[in-house]
Structure formats: structure tokens, C-alpha cells
């Protein structure tokens, strides 16, 4: 074998090795279809959530200020829950436009809207948890609640709740950034390559503060409420128990899927799960479960406000004074037909059932 043959053999081996080495390099996971899906479905869904959430929670705020005038801890929590949901839904037009096109609002608004979204997210869930504790005190510890469930304590705990929500949302403010990739501008939470710890902590924070602690609190409070109501011989007891189950089931049904998907996304970020097909399905699941969770802020006014007899009465009074569209006035008359003239209740003050009835 001469030097030319050796050179040819070496060249052939090099081409062979390069070919198979290239074949073994993992190909990038393409997700163009996911973006197209988001562009088509997310903007109209976000728009619907924005409209219904804005309308429902605005009515709650107006009724509370016009008729209730914040006389109790429950009123304070209802007001703050409505403000939390309003803060949350006001960020949706920006995310809707972003899903349809790209981020065009600059770095400043990217940080502000991301932070506002998270503050609304955390504070809304925290106030739902406080509503559960408020009902627990009113029904299970009725005597003690006369001292604890005051307007002053309601304001103090609300301020503390907003402080915790703001602090929990700081990572969104600090790490949200704008960047351009393939002529497309993004607004995302972006960590440095060596900050895996922050990714894990942020996901765990959402799972723990957004689901585990609130759900655990609600399960404890409502199980004790049901236990107390079982000893009450009352014709409206079954309705109250059904409403308790509805509150827990709706919270679990709307928020648990989103938290599970976020946990799986964390495993992908940590490279525990590595499969392109799974990642694509996970991205679809994130879009679907996130939108499902958004809908819960539209249901909060119905769950915690409109289903109470007193609040329905106030709502009828509000629409009686309206000079708006004909359909709203027709809806007003329909509400009046199904609402009692007086907020009758057979719950006694000693058991606190009247508070549950009004809140639900």
C-alpha cells in the first residue's frame, strides 16, 4: 500500500465517521405547529376571558361600594378578590396580542405586565384561601369569630396578603425580558444558563403557593364546615354542603391541571424528561390548561358573590337604576323573579350559617 492509498483510506474513514457522527447529533425539537395553534385559538379565548372577567368583577366592586359599604371581613375579602381578578384580566389583552403576533410593547411593559399577571395570580388564590378561613371561623368557631372577623382584621390580613403576593411575584419582574430570535420578539422569563436553581424554585413556588397550600387549607376548612353543618337540622343545609363541594371541585378542576403541567415542564427543563414528542404535547397542554385556569377568574364573581341571596338583591337594585341596553334590563327582571324580596335565612347566628349563605 502506497502513501496515496493510505491517504485515500484515511479520507474515506473521515467521511464515514463524520457522516455517522452527524446522524447521531440530536436534531432540534421543532414547534412551529404549536405557535400556529396559539396564534389561532389563544387571542379569542383571552378576549372572552377578559370581557367576562372585567364585567363580572367590575359589577362586584360597584355593588360592594354602592350597597355593602365594606362592613365586614367578608366584604373586604370579596373586594380584594375582585381587584385581584381585575388586575389579572387587565394583562390578558397584552398576552392575546403577543400570542397572535409578537411582543411589540418594549422591555418596560414586558416586565410590568409579567409582574402584574403574577401579582393577580397569587393574590387571587390567596384571597380564595382567606375566604375559606373566614367561612371556617364563622361557622365552626362562631363565638370566637365575633372578635376575629372584624373589618380591621380584614384590612390588616388583606394588606399582608398583597405584600406576600408582591414578593412572590418579584422573580417575574426581575427575570422577564425581551429578546429577538429569528426575527421574532419574545417576552419571556429567561434565566441565565447556570441558573437552574431559579427555574426549579420558580416552578416549585407556583406549585406550592398556587395549589398545595391553598388546596390543603380549603380541604381542611370545608371538611370542618361540613362536619359542623351535619349537626344542624336545617332545610338549607344540603344546599350549603353542595356549594362547599362546588367551590373545592371548581378550584381543583381549574387550577390542578395547570400546576401538574408546570411541574412536568420543570422536569423537561432539568432534562429529566427528554422526548421531542412529549415536549410538543406538553406545550399544547400548557396553552390549554393555562387558558382553563384563566376562566376561574370569571367564575369567582358567580361562586362567591352572585349566588348569595343578599347579593342577588343588590344586583337587581343596581340594574334597576341602569339606563343601559334592553337586554341588561330584561336580565334584571329575570333575576328579580328568582330572588327573594327579603334576604330570608333559617341559619342561626350561633352556628354562623347565615354568613356561609350570604357568602355563597
UniProtKB/Swiss-Prot annotation:
GO cellular component, one term: external side of plasma membrane
Assigned keywords, A-Z: Cell membrane, Disulfide bond, G-protein coupled receptor, Glycoprotein, Membrane, Phosphoprotein, Receptor, Transducer, Transmembrane, Transmembrane helix
Glycosylation sites: 183, 194
Membrane topology: Multi-pass membrane protein
Tissue: Expressed in thymus, spleen, heart, small intestine and lymph node.
Protein function: High affinity receptor for the C-C type chemokines CCL17/TARC and CCL22/MDC. The activity of this receptor is mediated by G(i) proteins which activate a phosphatidylinositol-calcium second messenger system. Could play a role in lipopolysaccharide (LPS)-induced endotoxic shock. In the CNS, could mediate hippocampal-neuron survival.
Protein name, per record: C-C chemokine receptor type 4
